[in-house]
Amino acid sequence: MRAVKGRTHISIARFWGAGLLFSLLPGLLLPAVGVAAEGSSPQPVAQVAAPTDLSPEEQATIAVFDRAARSVVFIANTAMQRDPWSFNLFEVSQGSGTGFVWSRQGHIVTNYHVIYGADSITVTLADRTEYKAKVIGADPDHDVAVLQIQASEATLQPVSIGNSQSLRVGQKVLAIGNPFGLDHTLTTGVVSALGRTIKSMSNRTIEGVIQTDAAINPGNSGGPLLDSGGRLIGVNTQIVSPSGAFAGIGFAVPVDTVNRIVPELIKHGKLIRPGLGISLVPDAMARRWGVKGVIIGKVGRGSAAERIGLHGARETAGGRIELGDIIVAVDGKPVESIDDLMDSMEQHKVGDQVTIEFARGNRRMQATATLQPVN
């Protein structure tokens, strides 16, 4: 969700400002209008209601916003383009989004799609100071990216980290972001559903996604979804809308996933995944051949898969292609697609042992593999 610059809103504000000025001019030119004439009966004066105290819920929401808004940043993404006639390079806005301060070392977390294709990224803090940012690491499969700015620790307020495992449908949530370029906009809602799946830019499935009805619009991408205590529970990433504007269904990558990925991106610049060291036949081909499971295309030399004797596809002496082993389960959990296999791997870390169940011809076999780091 990329937002456009808020020029329309500015021009509307000016229009309404001008209209208000003109509507006041008659009163300025005719000061007697509305003033009681001498000797006439006094006109009733409207009574202004006394201010009422805010409810405890309102006070709590205000306190959360005041505390968390300092962690939320505005991200502008620009790219360089060459004029086809003059061959001069010039900057073109790619859009804008939201992010939040992760650490006092200047790490900023946002969505990968917010900074995709950027040649230059500008981060604006809550105090309006601007910094050029560099990309430290990105994981397109989970739509997460980490930036870094050179700002003093005193100016950075990291967001408070919560957890997403204990979330309940119906609990209150708050979203802070920059929809349509309108910075630090607060919206509230509830957790509408848990355990949703969405597709990332790389067409990978993101599991365990939070669904919310807190308004999320273009420009909110990469912003924090908070619980009622102001703790981060997700990163706003997508909406379902036929018009492109909010229609009551928004999605956030759960914080437990983010909290696993971000330290890896800061340390390595990419997500180090556990795996078997194999390449796989696309799901579409497996379905076409009527295969249920994931077909191994090639086994890497010295890989975890080779060490347990898994076979890839091979050409027979007669020139016929023989399918590789078909992975059908990991630790007893069925595997029917590449996404299923990768999701199973992501539940573990490098060095963990997993039980691989696979089919070879008419035989069903099992082996225990020690997971290795893979790209």
State where each predicted segment sits.
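N-terminal secretory signal peptides that target proteins for export/translocation
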Residues: 1-12
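Bacterial N-terminal signal peptides
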Residues: 17-31
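Serine-dependent protease modules
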Residues: 36-289, 298-301, 319, 338-342, ...
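Short, solvent-exposed beta-edge and connector elements
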Residues: 87-89, 295, 308-314
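Conserved PDZ fold ligand-binding element
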Residues: 108-109, 307-338
